Curated annotation (Swiss-Prot):
It is found in: Cytoplasm; Cytoplasmic vesicle. Serine hydrolase involved in the detoxification of formaldehyde. It holds the Pfam family Esterase. This is S-formylglutathione hydrolase. It comes from the Eukaryota. It comes from Rattus norvegicus. Belongs to the esterase D family. The keyword Cytoplasm applies. PANTHER family: S-FORMYLGLUTATHIONE HYDROLASE. The gene is Esd. The modification N6-acetyllysine is found at residue 200. Gene3D superfamilies: alpha/beta hydrolase. One of its GO terms (biological process) is formaldehyde catabolic process.
Length: 282
């Protein structure tokens, strides 16, 4: 699998790089960002995958979150893929900001015309890790995942659908119960069709109820002044209730005065990287 380097910038002793490759799953060219800490020059490091939110590319997280300082300190390789296939020339892919381009929702679409390209779930859990493991100094046994909003949803479902694959999971303002919120209903109806029983396979709150894997410790930060919390897009209470019932440990922190933006993410990113480092470096 050929990788084309798009950029490389020294940052906190390591290198922040962006690559492009031709994706088999998505049948298009895809970019991903990867931060290689200084420790990666001499040893295989754990890998931490970040999934971004609606409208984002691979750039938002690496330029706005300030993740590199903590990643350098803890010796973590941080990988940030794009949020959807790009340039597939599907009718309607650019019609709205919350569906199609920049809004893959980390599902494998089953509905025509999306099912050929929109396979972000398999891309993130299978194709991309294989590519990373083959080309970079990462330890394939030590991986974790986190994300924001739509990507927080993605991180939670990837961890819950693959017991034991990820050492830890965390999220900022995740879409916790997409089968019940407007964003989720729109995306799932488009990608997965009208049969709502299929939607549950990609809903963290539904997945928790049937989870039977090894214990997984979940960290969630949520801004109290997040407009998408107040208008019912995120529904964290439903997820927490399901976790409590299943005795799955969740640290849920409602952060006074914070919104849905990268200013919020940047404030708490070090806490999240520390959370993952605790499990990845154990």
């Amino acid at each position: 699998m050929e990788l084309k380097q798009i950029s490389s910038n020294k940052c906190f002793g390591g290198l922040q790089k962006v690559f492009e490759h031709s994706s088999v799953e998505l049948k298009c060219k895809m970019k991903f960002a990867i931060y290689l800490p200084p420790q990666a020059e001499s040893a295989k490091c754990p890998a931490l995958y970040w999934l971004s939110g609606l409208t984002c590319t691979e750039q938002n997280f690496i330029s706005k979150s300030g993740c590199q300082q903590a990643a350098s300190e803890h010796g973590l390789v941080v990988i940030a893929p794009d949020t959807s296939p790009r340039g597939c020339n599907i009718k309607g892919e650019d019609d709205s900001w919350d569906f199609g381009t920049g809004a893959g929702f980390f599902v494998n679409a089953t509905e025509d015309p999306w099912n050929t390209n929109y396979r972000m779930y398999s891309y993130v859990t299978e194709e991309l890790p294989q590519l990373i493991n083959a080309n970079f100094p990462v330890d394939p046994q030590r991986i974790s995942i986190f994300g924001h909003s739509m990507g927080g949803h993605g991180a939670l479902i990837c961890a819950l659908k693959n017991p034991g694959k990820y050492r830890s999971v965390s999220a900022f303002a995740p879409i916790c119960n997409p089968v019940l919120c407007p964003w989720g209903k729109k995306a799932f109806n488009g990608y997965l069709g009208p049969d709502q029983s299929k939607w549950k396979a990609y809903d963290a709150t539904c997945l928790v109820k049937s989870y039977s894997g090894p214990q997984i410790d979940i960290l969630i930060d949520q801004g109290k002044d997040d407009e998408f919390l107040s208008n019912g897009q995120l529904l964290p209470d439903n997820f927490i209730a399901a976790c409590t019932e299943k005795k799955i440990p969740v640290v849920f922190r409602l952060q006074e005065g914070y919104d849905h933006s990268y200013y919020f993410i940047a404030t708490f990113i070090t806490d999240h990287i520390r959370h993952h480092a605790k499990y990845l470096n154990a």
